[in-house]
């Protein structure tokens, strides 16, 4: 029911019934991504369009895909183009996202219940994704989670003991790690790391929620953060650099009353762009720095 996929390495139904897939950077796919699949969607790669001309295809047929324009520009020309829920910036968030699993352990795997974990084949890592629905569109942020697996991680599944089983191989494509294949178990130690729990869109900016209370005096400062935004080209070349990059002005940082969150107000938010956040200055109430200081939010719909 969808066209324009490039190299889907993972397909999974969400707990609420929607189907998502991961795709790998390459021709007509500017960066690796996570996307929802809806009937009639076009995901950007034109090589499979001819099959949509068969009588079994009951949706509109996309034709004349522009070569070299920015993804948000093509979306204006081709309404059927499905913008990703999450872009995975190249090398910052792996290179080859694959299988995925939602954490339905209700806290037995740690503080990220309900979030999505995605394996990466090249990086031998597991990434973390926090999705939200804004004006009927799924979008959200991705974060580093765990690196250093035996080799390329391609599948994951939660086991009956609420640990995450990760299946791996380096067959076909090289990746980090020196084993030809592997199966490893990732368990929560019971200690909660100081992390950005979620990054969500609010009018004029983003809300960060943390896994433990912050030092408000230190963290609620504009100098604690940096943000830039960029997007990608839709073209026949292999992948796309980050393009149309802009440093964004953070105008205010407002602490939530419970000291577990910050509202970051930003000038110049752009639809169809990754908003990359660096939170180097954030400190917990106990004086800890964030375990991972970067977050990458793919903004498609603005929050009302």
Task: Give the label of every model feature segment.
Residues 1-202, 216:
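Beta-propeller domains with acidic blade repeats across secreted/periplasmic ectodomains
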Residues 56-60, 122, 205, 232, ...:
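Charge-rich, low-complexity amphipathic helices
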Residues 190-195, 215, 231-233, 240-242, ...:
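Acidic, Ser/Thr/Gly/Pro-rich low-complexity segments and short DxT(G/T)-type signature motifs
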Residues 46, 66, 78, 134, ...:
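Intrinsically disordered, low-complexity segments enriched in small/polar residues
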């Amino acid at each position: 029911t969808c066209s324009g996929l490039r190299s889907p390495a993972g397909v999974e139904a969400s707990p609420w019934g929607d189907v998502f897939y991961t795709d790998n950077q390459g021709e007509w796919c500017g960066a690796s991504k996570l996307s929802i699949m809806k009937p009639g969607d076009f995901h950007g790669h034109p090589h499979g369009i001819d099959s949509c001309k068969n009588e079994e295809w009951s949706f509109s047929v996309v034709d004349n895909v522009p070569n070299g324009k920015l993804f948000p520009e093509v979306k204006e020309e081709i309404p059927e183009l499905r913008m990703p829920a999450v872009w995975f910036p190249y090398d910052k968030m792996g290179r080859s996202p694959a299988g995925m699993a939602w954490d339905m352990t209700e806290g037995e795997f740690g503080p990220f219940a309900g979030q999505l974990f995605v394996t990466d084949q090249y990086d031998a890592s597991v990434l973390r994704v926090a999705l939200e629905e804004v004006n009927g569109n799924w979008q959200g942020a991705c974060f580093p989670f765990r690196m250093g697996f035996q080799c390329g991680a391609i599948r994951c599944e939660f086991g009956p003991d609420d640990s995450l089983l990760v299946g791996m191989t380096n067959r076909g494509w090289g990746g980090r790690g020196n084993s030809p294949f592997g199966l490893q178990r990732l368990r929560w130690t019971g200690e909660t790391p100081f992390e950005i729990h979620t990054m969500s869109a609010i009018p004029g900016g983003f809300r960060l929620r943390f896994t433990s209370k912050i030092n408000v005096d230190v963290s609620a400062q504009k100098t604690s953060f940096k943000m830039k935004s960029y997007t990608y080209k839709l073209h026949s070349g292999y992948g796309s650099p980050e393009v149309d990059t802009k440093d964004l002005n953070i105008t205010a940082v407002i602490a939530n009353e419970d000291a577990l969150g910050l509202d970051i107000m930003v000038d110049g938010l752009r639809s169809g762009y990754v908003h990359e956040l660096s939170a180097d200055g954030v400190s917990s109430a106990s004086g800890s720095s964030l375990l991972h200081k970067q977050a990458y939010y793919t903004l498609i719909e603005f929050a009302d």
